[in-house]
C-alpha cells in the first residue's frame, strides 16, 4: 500500500478531508467518487434535530461570497456552471450572467433565465442541504469560516426552477424530493456528500427516506463536486 493509499484510508475512516495534491488530485477524486452513497449514508451519525436557536442566514457569512477568489460571486459561478447559451455582461471579466437557459435538474423543464429585478427569480440557487437544516444537524458547531464554505460550496449548490426552490424551503429528504423521479438518486447522494464533508448528521426519518431512494440505485456513487 502506497503512502497516499494509507492517507486515503485513514482519512476515510476518520471522516477527514483529504489534502489536495496538484499532481495526484485526479487520482484522489477518482478514489473518492468510488464511495457509494449507501456506504456514505451508513457512516453518518443519526440524531434528532438540534434547537434552531441562533440560526440566521448571517451565520453563514455574506450571501454569495467570492470564496474561491476568482473575481466572481458564487451565484454567478453556479449560473455559469449550470446554464447553457450564456450571454455575459461586458466589462465584468466574464462574471455576470445576463441570459441563459437552464435544464432544470428538479423538474426536467427548460427555463429561460433573464437577469432582472423580478425575472431573475425564475432561476434560483438552491442549497442542496438547506442552511437551516444544516444548522440543526450540526452546522451550529462549525466555525464561521466552515459555515461560509458550506454556504458557497458548489457541491451544495444547484441552479433550479425558482418555484421548486421555494417549495422545498428548508426541507430534508423526508419532507421534500424533486418531482423528477429520475434525479432523486443523484439528489439524495448529493445531500449525503455534503453532510459527510461537513460532518453533519441525519435524523432517523431523513435517513430512512434517503435509504428508500438509494435502494433503487444501490450503485449510486457519492459526488465530489
Task: State each model region's role.
Residues 29, 90, 179-182:
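A general boundary/transition motif marking the beginning of the first structured unit of a protein
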Residues 2-26:
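Secretory targeting and sorting signals
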Residues 97, 106-225:
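Domain-level detector of nuclease and nuclease-like folds
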